[in-house]
Regions:
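Alpha-helical bundle regulatory/interaction domains
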Residues: 1-182
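Short, basic interhelical loop/turn and adjoining N-cap
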Residues: 185
Length: 185
């Protein structure tokens, strides 16, 4: 299933809609407890000025597949800005809170405000996946299926603590009546 909206974090959505397309895909059901969605951004600025896109980051880890290399973006605390020129696309996986931890043996806190090569976390298969994604710009369903396959091959055993944290964060995100931390108790 696709979700065609630009999302909550995209600043200046009117300008963004004229410069980029953003499509979201649901992950395979077996990955849904780890990955909230995949996102694909495409642009064609050939013959046009570069477009600077600003995004308010969500408190999530992302696997980002793009030229020249795949990266893992840790939870950021600042505005994300990307200059888009020429023609291109980027495919990402937005992990749920607590959903990335089972895929790595390092503390997720070590990734905070950092961008690291995906191969450091996932091994050399991440570079091969990145090459496939960059070559496969046309078939969006196939790209999402390829990322599904990559992550399914690395699916960890369930982590009860991560699942509990994810449930708590989801409750907080969905609760419109919460305004103080002590209301969670």
């Amino acid at each position: 299933m696709t979700f065609p909206d630009l999302g909550r974090g995209v600043l200046h959505p009117g300008r963004a809609a004229a410069a980029i397309s953003l499509i979201r895909y649901e992950p395979a059901p077996e990955l849904a407890r780890f990955v909230e969605f995949y996102w694909l951004v495409r642009w064609n600025r050939d013959g046009l000025p570069a477009h600077e896109q600003k995004v308010l980051v969500h408190p999530s880890v992302h696997l980002v597949l793009e030229a020249p290399a795949a990266h893992v973006h840790g939870v950021g605390k600042s505005l994300f800005v990307r200059r888009l020129e020429g023609t291109g696309h980027v495919l990402g996986a937005k992990f749920r809170p607590g959903g990335f931890r089972p895929f790595t043996d390092r503390p997720v806190a070590d990734l905070a405000d950092r961008i690291v090569p995906a191969a450091e976390v996932f091994g050399p298969g991440a570079d091969r996946l990145n090459d496939e994604v960059l070559r496969g710009a046309g078939d969006l369903d196939a790209l999402a299926a390829r990322v599904d396959s990559f992550l399914l091959a690395r699916t960890p055993a369930p982590d009860p603590v991560a699942e509990q944290v994810a449930a708590m964060v989801e409750r907080i995100a969905d609760a419109t009546d919460l305004s103080r931390v002590d209301q969670l108790a």
